[in-house]
Amino acid sequence: MEILEKEGPAYERRKQRFQSWYESVFKWHPNFMYTPNQVINWTEIKKPMSEWKVGLVSSSGAHLRSQKPFDIVSDEGDWSYREIPVETDPKDIMISDSHYDHSDADLDVNCMFPILTLKELVKDGVISSIPSKFYSFMGFVPVPQDLITQTAPEVAQKLADEKVDVVILTPGCAVCHQTLGIIQNIIEGVGITTIMTTLKPELTEQVHVPRAAYLKYPYGYSAGPANDLNMQKTIVKDVLELIPVIKEPGSIVKMPYRWHGHIE
């Protein structure tokens, strides 16, 4: 297990990449508010993985085709969320988000919103169960005040009401990494253990999240490659297996998977 160091040359390079991104983001989104978690919430789980009820929260912009799409026009973003029943056919899920390329996810939403993956892990006995609903945000929320005070706490409470043990979170765009880190920390604060996948560890570590798994994939594949359920299952299982071995809040573990192609 390779945990990203919080000091030294590699950390300084990531910090510089974050600073470069932070300076550039205002060219496109002048109202962006950098909003790191001031305190990292931390909940340990004592049960074995085979007894976990695992929930899913994504900032991919996924929603049912029958639901109102997310607002991709507002300068302040859209901090609302959509409830997606777990029995939903993945073909009935679409993505509304103009801030990353989700072309492959439009054909296989499971690479961003791993609804089928988690159901398969229940069948395989890897985890015990899943709740009745999963949750999706459109992660472009440059002004996250209402997310922090309203919608993220609502979702956290709904997960707690269903007695969810663990939540896995998957991001969409760059700003989504901050949005998802905020949501993650709020969920962890109600006593649910969480882990997020990150495609940009330089962003995630500056948001200060409980724990994360760095997947060196491009935007649009935060739960694995498209049209490869076996690899999606392997990745999500491996991410979940990190939870009991990560002991320090704020840790990011580098996963051993590599994308065969260009990554921005």
Predicted segments with their positions:
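Metallocofactor- and cofactor-centric catalytic cores in central/energy metabolism, strongly enriched
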Residues: 1-264
